[in-house]
A protein has these predicted regions:
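Acidic, polar-rich low-complexity tracts and alpha-helical solenoid repeat scaffolds
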Residues: 2-8, 16-272
């Protein structure tokens, strides 16, 4: 029994080496047709990395031929199935542009956009892929409004937009926590302008006021009055938008301090 198992194992290893040898032989010395047939075989067997190598090898030979449409689609899918999402997005997009009348164009357009979505990193990293994903998904919805993938595309856009909102909010908070209050106020304004319905609105307006407060109280005398008045205006807008905010008890105390500083400035100006 044990001998039989060893024999079977040896056969499997030998077969593996034989298959590997056949692949390398066709890859390096096979005709374009042999490479194409083996690439399709590797693709069907879900050996996508080997399939990609062969497809890349034969692409120049098949450019302009009927098989090229199938090759480009399989290359796109192979990258997608190996989780190389940035490359998959690129190749699916290339397929859509090269074969706009293909029966697979809608599927390819969605998978291009969805690949960008899958390539989108966590909010703390660069969001280039996130922005490209939103644009691609919006383009897909515009071109294929009746597609059954539209609800998924809208859901993906919402998720990606929330990620960009969080990125914008965290950047503004970072300026605030590093005491760069001028930059913080600009960043909070950008967040509120770019994402009108943002769930961060209350906290953003609160932190913008505190940035204005610290900017005013820490200013040199010639800028203090102007900046304190600006902080008071920022607070008025905050209170108008959130009359029941949990932050109001704190901010009203700060407003009282600012009013006292303004009174002191008025006294100094009167004495001069």
């Amino acid at each position: 029994m044990q001998k039989n198992k060893i024999y079977i194992f040896i056969l499997l290893v030998a077969f593996g080496f034989s298959s590997c040898g056949e692949y390398q032989k066709v890859l390096n010395k096979g005709t374009s047709e042999e490479q194409y047939l083996l690439a399709v075989k590797m693709y069907d067997e879900q050996k996508y990395t080997k399939a990609i190598q062969l497809f890349e090898k034969i692409t120049p030979s098949y450019k302009g031929k009927p098989q090229m449409e199938r090759i480009q689609y399989m290359v796109s899918q192979a990258h997608y199935n190996t989780k190389q999402y940035s490359l998959a997005a690129y190749y699916f997009d290339k397929f859509v542009k090269s074969y706009p009348k293909s029966s697979k164009v809608e599927e390819a357009a969605y998978l291009s956009a969805y690949s960008y979505y899958l390539a989108s990193p966590v909010y703390s990293l660069d969001q280039k892929d996130t922005k490209e994903a939103i644009t691609a998904l919006q383009t897909f919805i515009y071109k294929f409004p009746d597609s059954d993938k539209v609800p998924d595309a809208n859901k993906n856009i919402k998720e990606l937009t929330l990620k960009l909102e969080k990125k914008s909010f965290e950047i503004a908070k970072q300026y605030y926590h590093t005491q760069d209050y001028t930059a913080a106020m600009v960043a909070f304004d950008n967040l509120l302008a770019d994402y009108l319905g943002t769930s961060y609105k209350e906290e953003a307006m609160y932190l913008k006021f505190k940035s204005a407060y610290y900017l005013g109280t820490n200013s040199i005398i010639v800028k203090k009055e102007e900046r304190i008045n600006e902080a008071i205006k920022v607070h008025q807008r905050f209170e108008r938008n959130f009359p029941n905010s949990k932050y109001l008890e704190e901010t009203k105390k700060l407003i009282s301090e600012l009013s006292n500083e303004l009174n002191a400035i008025t006294v100094i100006k009167t004495q001069n």
